[in-house]
Amino acid sequence: MSADAPEQVPGQFTLVLHTHLPWLAHHGRWPVGEEWLYQSWSAAYLPLMRVLRTLAAEGRRGVLTLGMTPVVTAQLDDPYCLDGMHRWLANWQLRALEAATLHTPTGAEPGTASTPEALRQFGIREYDEAGRALEEFGTLWRHGASPLLRELIDAGTVELLGGPLAHPFQPLLNPRLREFALREGLADAGQPLA
């Protein structure tokens, strides 16, 4: 190779993250209700956005393609869900505080995960993580996911991928319903984010 020739890339790698949950707001708490949304939000969406915002701040571009169904995006922007998530995070921190201050013997064998000391250590870690999530949510997420996604898209860090309106198993749908789900989902993805 000459000194002027660009270095060849030995291969390419594409990272595509796809996310989907059904509409969970106002459908109860547990086991398949809002608790599922809030757990996913705290364990997946908050850390993912944290990492992507860090990469965007470093000037990283073309990091990944993110598939967000309209149902998920709508819930992450919905005022009812935003309030519910804030309450869920506060309750997470309270549950962690209870575990962190546990002094009652549990009857567990020494050295197991359910001893008071193990539960205290778990509670301390969870309390710290819940506090971080609460602070981050309060400062970054109070207006939903769309402003955060818009920031990442504008920075060129993330490419947003459209898809079906919901997430049915496409081959089993009536062709008219399949066409509707894809057409409306892509139209939704074409709408400008905050």
Labelled PLM ranges:
Residues M1-A194:
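Carbohydrate-active enzymes and regulators
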